[in-house]
């Protein structure tokens, strides 16, 4: 596991040569191929936060960790704050009947329903009566009225119609 930086010609060659390798993996196939073929390789030991998010499960877990009371990767850490550039969009709008619990809500989002233990991207609309739990909702998503979204990852630019149920309640 790690972070890899390649020049495009070297990476392209290695991927083409190893494309038929079952379960082709950087650490098991691509890096050894580059080493055997005389490519210059360098390593840097990094002791800060790092998490492999190469699967949907690990991506979901990493996002859920962001909303822990004291996350391993703290978006608000003094020496390493994370900034975003969302352009000129309004702040969040939370209707008076909304319920939000232990979640990250980005700018431009309008919430008319409930959000629990979730990460909500920018410019998202969550309709009246909708309930979002344990989910990641990417930017520019519309979730219709009376929907239930449980333990799901919703890609950007998706519109979920009214009265839809997605995911599995744990």
Can you name each region flagged by the protein language model?
Residues 3-13:
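Conserved nucleotide-sugar donor-binding
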Residues 9, 17-170:
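Left-handed beta-helix
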């Amino acid at each position: 596991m790690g972070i890899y930086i390649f020049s495009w010609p070297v990476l392209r060659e290695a991927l083409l040569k190893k494309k038929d390798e079952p379960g082709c993996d950087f650490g098991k196939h691509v890096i050894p191929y580059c080493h055997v073929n005389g490519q210059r390789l360098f390593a840097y030991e990094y002791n800060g936060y790092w998490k492999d998010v190469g699967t949907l499960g690990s991506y979901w877990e990493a996002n859920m960790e962001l909303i822990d009371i004291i996350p391993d990767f703290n978006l608000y850490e003094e020496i390493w704050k994370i900034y975003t550039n969302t352009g000129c969009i309004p702040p969040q709008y939370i209707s008076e009947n909304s319920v939000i619990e232990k979640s990250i809500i980005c700018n431009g989002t309008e919430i008319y329903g409930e959000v629990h233990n979730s990460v909500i991207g920018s410019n998202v609309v969550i309709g009246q009566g909708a309930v979002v739990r344990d989910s990641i909702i990417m930017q520019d998503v519309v979730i219709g009225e009376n929907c239930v979204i449980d333990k799901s990852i919703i890609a950007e630019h998706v519109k979920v119609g009214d009265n839809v149920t997605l995911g599995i309640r744990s």
